């Protein structure tokens, strides 16, 4: 994966390399109240030049609408774990268990850097949900 065809470091820049992930098979009871969502990324970049980072957005409607983006710190050149969100972070919206099922939940990851020649490696994407 690379940083796309533009040099903007904005998470919402359209000329960035983006990838969708889904089918997390989250076992949520239909009566669950969602308290928070956490996304784990295991990733690195080929260099820190251009301040490479990953931006993550969530969708509960199959990708029709998206949450505001959250971004990692600058990626290092050795694989590390980056965690976005948390046990009490709902990413700016209210979720239902059905939205977090395989038909609804999408994770969109954008590769962002201020240089065009940055290469990214993403080895793991995980989603966990805190609920009652």
Please give the residue ranges for each predicted region:
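Disulfide-rich extracellular domains of secreted proteins
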Residues: 1-132
């Amino acid at each position: 994966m690379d940083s796309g065809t533009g040099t903007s470091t904005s998470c919402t820049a359209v000329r960035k390399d983006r990838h969708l992930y889904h089918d997390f098979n989250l076992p949520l009871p239909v009566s669950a109240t969602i308290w928070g969502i956490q996304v784990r990324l295991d990733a690195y970049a080929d260099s820190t030049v251009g301040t490479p980072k990953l931006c993550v957005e969530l969708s509960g409607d199959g990708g029709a609408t998206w949450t505001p983006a959250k971004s990692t710190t600058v990626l290092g050149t050795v694989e590390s774990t980056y965690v976005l969100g948390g046990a009490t972070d709902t990413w700016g919206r209210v979720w239902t268990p059905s939205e977090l099922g395989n038909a609804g939940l999408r994770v969109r990851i954008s590769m962002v850097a201020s240089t065009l020649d940055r290469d990214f490696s993403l080895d793991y994407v995980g989603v966990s949900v805190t609920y009652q």
